Amino acid sequence: MIGAGIILLNSNNEVLLLLRDNKIEIPFPNMWDIPGGKVEDGESPEQAVRREMMEEMSIKNLGEINLFKILKTENLTDNIFWKRLNLNPKVIDLKEGQRIEYFNLERIRKTKLAFNYNQVLESFYSEIVIEY
């Protein structure tokens, strides 16, 4: 499977996370996650991120996004993008998930995230955020 997600970083260096729906039929129910999902046939990972942002949060124009990492495991190739973007979670028209919130690194470290995103975000903060 090929997946794509995006790390949305605000001007306070906090990451926007989505609390996944609490449905037993989905992986990692009721856990915090970065926005994203499965890359569909005929779609690039970047197109998938843009589609998922539209489907999950009604965000139509992300503008330029940056590739952070491509993570490969036995069953998954996960394309992780990032962008600086200040969004107000209270005005986002959330279509999937229970809610969205900004997390700083300290809170991320105290929260078990879906998939392997704790490690991904640790790496992101040390490689990207440190430059700002």
Can you name each region flagged by the protein language model?
Residues 1, 29-34, 76-78:
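Short connector loops at helix/strand junctions that flank enzyme active sites
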Residues 60-69:
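A short coil-to-beta-strand element that immediately follows conserved catalytic motifs
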Residues 14-51, 55:
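Conserved Nudix-box catalytic region and its N-terminal flanking loop in Nudix hydrolases
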Residues 1-16:
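Conserved N-terminal beta-strand and adjoining loop/helix that marks the start
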Residues 10-12, 69-91, 101-107, 123-124:
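Active-site-adjacent beta-strand/loop module that shapes the phosphate/pyrophosphate-binding cleft
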Residues 25, 93-132:
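Nudix hydrolase/Nudix homology domain
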